[in-house]
Amino acid sequence: MKFLGLRIDDHDSNVTYTDGKKVKYCATERLYGIKHHGWDNIWQWEDVLNKWDIKVEDLDAIAIITDDINFEEGESYRELDMGFPCRTFAVDHHYAHHLSIWPVGEVPHTGYVYDGYGNDNHSFSLIQGEKVSITHDAEEYGSIGTEMANVGIQVGLKADPQGLDLAGKVMGLAAYGLIDKEYYEKISQHGFVDIKRIWNYKSWTRKWDNDFDINWLRTVHEYTGDQLALFLSHPVGGDDIIGYSGGVAQNCNFNGKIRKTGQGVLIPPHANDCGLSLGAVEFLRRRFHEEPFSNEGFPFWQDDEAPEEEPDDRTIEKAAISLRDGQILAWYQGHGEIGPRALGHRSILMSARNRRAKLHLNRDVKHREHFRPFGAAVLKEDTSKYFDYDGDSPYMNTSVPVLDEGLSSVTHVDGSCRIQTVDGDDSFARLLRKYKEMTGDSVILNTSLNISGSPIASRIWEAKEMFSKKGINTMVIGNNLFDK
């Protein structure tokens, strides 16, 4: 059967189509070059179908995620009459988040979703099977994502019009503070449900009578992560593996705490709203009792421009030499990644031991705040050599302690690093192995191929435009290597 999943809203619109075998995916920010792009009317998604040469009349069912629909308590979907020639459903925002886990593994029975807000202003939902069984109202209890974004506004961080990037920036900023143990104990009286009270800065100012204090941010951020990890480590059904999604699941610091508990958890790389259309087609698959979809090629499913060739051994060797010599290397291969992290197809790479890399990349290449940290890609078999971690982290969504003090460019001020474990034999893994052969190191700095305020490059000309500006020394697009 032919299914279409649509995320239609004012930000992070995306489309997924499947014929039961292949999956097509488009995040419209990559299509239009506007970060967090959202459709302002319900028909713009036809542009994507036209690009894919798909007609609405050929579809068997459509599922839509939009935050404008109110669902009854416990209701996870509703059939709509929108005049389409096929059955059409609205799916609850948080339920779709949970179902979107399917490309990384079987969707667990129990799922926890935390984000800014979804349908009915819910900031948290507990999913059990097909039922949204427990929810928290953002207006009453607050929202982790929203409260963190509000902090970003308070301290004057640059933001997109809706403040969607602020929570991530605040996550990086929090590490610069110190934990106030007395205040940590004070807010512990609120438990974990009342996020508004936990993130109430006025209670801190009443204590210290000062302007914004980074120690307050570090303390409440640490407390929130600790409580979240404790909560998820005791799942309602006692499940061995749970699902965890929503925008808050992009918080690598929190994810590191969760994984440290030993609780089995599946966190997709598209945990934010860019994955909702994937959840929509999974809803339709279940509704119509179809076979599970193939996840072949995941997470490199972006409908963007891919080079015609892959890099050969000689090109990979030249790229590794560039990294060995301390150069900044842009790497554009295949189709782009789903989600906000670059995982080796749309990357800017550099030595993890360059002391000036963070300053140089933030100031001259990415054009973003000086305090922003960088992640690392490491060969999976060597992970424990560099980091206090021995598991998988293929999607760079977990922060772990750094063991090697020499990894200055990827070590955040709190001694942690967001890591991507790499295995297999694709071109990125081959590059890492060649670099290891030359230097003895199998870890490099890996950040996304974009500048602040723009989406990750999705067209070859966009990558070349970045290369033409200050900062990047070498670029590899497919099998073509460009030097300055």
Pin down the residues of each PLM region.
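Phosphate/ATP-binding catalytic cores across multiple sugar-kinase/actin-like superfamilies
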Residues: 218-242
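Short beta-strand-loop/turn "lid" adjacent to the catalytic site in phosphate-handling enzymes
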Residues: 50-90, 100-101
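Phosphate/pyrophosphate-binding loops at sites that engage ATP/ADP/AMP, CoA/4′-phosphopantetheine
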Residues: 44-60, 232-240
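Active-site pocket-shaping loop/turn-to-helix segments
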Residues: 30-40, 218
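Extreme N-terminal starter segment of soluble prokaryotic enzymes
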Residues: 1-4
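Flexible beta->alpha loop and helix N-cap segments adjacent to enzyme active/binding sites
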Residues: 7-34, 82, 86-98, 103-172, ...
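Active-site cores of enzymes that catalyze phosphoryl transfer or operate on phosphate-rich substrates
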Residues: 172, 177-219
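Glycine-rich phosphate-binding loops at beta-strand->alpha-helix junctions
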Residues: 69-71, 241-257
